[in-house]
Amino acid sequence: GNADGSIPAWDGGLATNAGSVDSRGFLANPYASEQPLFTITAQNVDQYKDKLTPGQLAMFKRYPDTYKIPVYKTHRSATVPAAVQEAAKRNATTTKLVEGGNGLENFDTANPFPIPQNGLEVIWNHITRYRGGSVRRLVTQATPQVNGSYQLVYFQDAFTFRTNLKDYNPNKPSNVLFYFKQRVTAPSRLAGNVLLVHETLNQVKEPRLAWLYNAGQRRVRRAPQVSYDGPGTAADGLR
C-alpha cells in the first residue's frame, strides 16, 4: 500500500466466495453496493488535474456538462494460482533480460521480475502477465466515424500460453510465449479471414511469427506487419 492508505496493502486478492456465480460462470460484482467517494466534474476538475491524463482533461473541456469521473475506493482484488506465484518466486532469482532488453532468459510462466528494478522489467511483467492459461472469447468491435456512424465487426478470439499445453515441459526451452488465433465472423465481406500469431519471447532471436488467411483469395500469407504499432484487424487504423 501507500503512506496515506488510499492504496491498501495486497492481502492475497479476491476470495473465491467474494460473490455469487451465475449459470454461465460469471462472478457477480462484489462491490456493487459501493458508492463513489467523490465525483470529478468540469466544475472541480482543477483540484485533480495533476492526477488526470491530457485526454481526460480534454474530455472535460469538450463535454463540460456530461463528462464525469466517479472515484471509488481502491481494491487490490487481483490474484493468481499458487503455481503462478511459485513461478514468480523462481523467476526473481533466475530470469534475465537479454538482447538489450528485447528478450528473456530462464523465464517460467509469468511475472519474470516480481521486484522490478527498471522500466524494462515492468514492461516485461505486463507482457508476460498471467491471463488464465487459455481463453476463448467473442469480440464485437465498433470504429465510430466523426458523424457517429459505425460498422460492427465480430471476431472469435482464442489464445493459449505455452505453459498450458499438454506437452509442456519446463525443462525444454522454447522461444514461444503464447499462441493466438482470431477469426472474423461478420460482416460478410470480411467473414472467414483468420489471423494466427506465435508470440515469441526473444524477438531479436526470432521475430513474432504471424500468418493471415484471406477467405476471398483462399490463400495464407505471412504477416510481418503484425508487430509493434501495427493497426488492429478491421479498425480503420484507429486501434
Model-derived segments and spans:
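Acidic, serine/threonine- and glycine-rich low-complexity intrinsically disordered segments
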Residues: 194-239
